[in-house]
From Swiss-Prot:
It comes from the Viruses. It holds the Pfam family BTB. Kelch repeats lie at residues 216-261, 262-307, 309-354, 356-403, 405-449, 452-498. It comes from Vaccinia virus (strain Copenhagen). PANTHER family: KELCH PROTEIN, KELCH-LIKE PROTEIN 8. Keywords: Early protein, Kelch repeat, Repeat. This is Kelch repeat protein C2. Residues 2-67 form the BTB domain. Belongs to the poxviruses Kelch family. InterPro entries: BACK (IPR011705), BTB/POZ_dom (IPR000210), Kelch-typ_b-propeller (IPR015915), Kelch_1 (IPR006652), SKP1/BTB/POZ_sf (IPR011333).
Amino acid sequence: MESVIFSINGEIIQVNKEIITASPYNFFKRIQDHHLKDEAIILNGINYHAFESLLDYMRWKKINITINNVEMILVAAVIIDVPPVVDLCVKTMIHNINSTNCIRMFNFSKRYGIKKLYNASMSEIINNITAVTSDPEFGKLSKDELTTILSHEDVNVNHEDVTAMILLKWIHKNPNDVDIINILHPKFMTNTMRNAISLLGLTISKSTKPVTRNGIKHNIVVIKNSDYISTITHYSPRTEYWTIVGNTDRQFYNANVLHNCLYIIGGMINNRHVYSVSRVDLETKKWKTVTNMSSLKSEVSTCVNDGKLYVIGGLEFSISTGVAEYLKHGTSKWIRLPNLITPRYSGASVFVNDDIYVMGGVYTTYEKYVVLNDVECFTKNRWIKKSPMPRHHSIVYAVEYDGDIYVITGITHETRNYLYKYIVKEDKWIELYMYFNHVGKMFVCSCGDYILIIADAKYEYYPKSNTWNLFDMSTRNIEYYDMFTKDETPKCNVTHKSLPSFLSNCEKQFLQ
């Protein structure tokens, strides 16, 4: 029986010529046309056993493909050009792709020009970008490849600080391509991360490119209040949909977002004060009751920092309290801080670096009702007095911006709204131009290079230029807004000395 001889890495395999003649595949057709009878055909880049598997497929239309042999069979099928086997191998690889092998499969798909596998592995990288940074192959991605990945609209980053950490880890392996840092959008980064990048000697150029990463755009949580039940909804710029997260039957509560969970703190149910704190995961929509606070209270002030939820002051029945305590996310124990110097409810609290600033609100007992203008700072495990606000305010909203505090006041007893800036290093207050007036409740948060205010309309205040933008929007019956991101960048005063520790903490928090 006449045979065709193949040589693979010095090993000989003889194939019945009838199999070659009957083959519909181009590789074997060319052999029929050009084969020299007594010469072995040398096959390079093909595994001997993989070639045997292809021959079995040609004979019986069956082939044994496993996760262990799929790559060598696919390589052989690509070189020999056996499309049905290529398809079977690609399906097997796509079915088994995960965050630990997606970069290897991505590189494999490029090497052999397999588009379906390329798309699938790219999708896996995009969905698991923080996990794949631990892969030794991550640093071998080209600058253009990483730029493409991080510019994809669905890349799974929830804060631009996370994008920055991904880039810094890649730059560590590719120091000649530091200009990739320019894909960052500084206005979506925290001041702490911007300072860290500056201390590394890296400069982010001003960009006019559109923001493509949907995940870094601010998500919005809205609690729409009614007389008895408040509805919580969540808007994701990634999906561009509003979804109902759940309901709460509380009044006079406070709310804050930490690590993708909305905390509903204190308040009243059926005119009774409550200890409890409820938490809803904004992705899974699952509710959980966390450990009770130390006392019954409503109208507390809250702030978050370094993975902790801080609850300060509040109203215990008809008396203001000076209790300050915090709960670390994922734990069940409240930690008490020293009490405020002046008990209060309805004040504002905000972190600057690792210090808490509390201002305004109301001090009340059974005999007294005093609207406050005083300011306290918790630093080095004690409360100290700071310069008071220019006026007394019972409703105060405060945000940190570029190391200073901006305060907008609401209206109860006051006749108008005010905007103040507190210069932290100078312990000094200055009054700024206020665009709107006669608004009671509102939402205020820092959004990159501007401060967002949602009141009777949507406003953007730009501190550096002291200018305002106005956008019409309906805010009827909506009394609480919050913008949130999944991750909390550790807030600290980053210096050359503390920079390695800061970056190490960020890497542990964001990329592991």
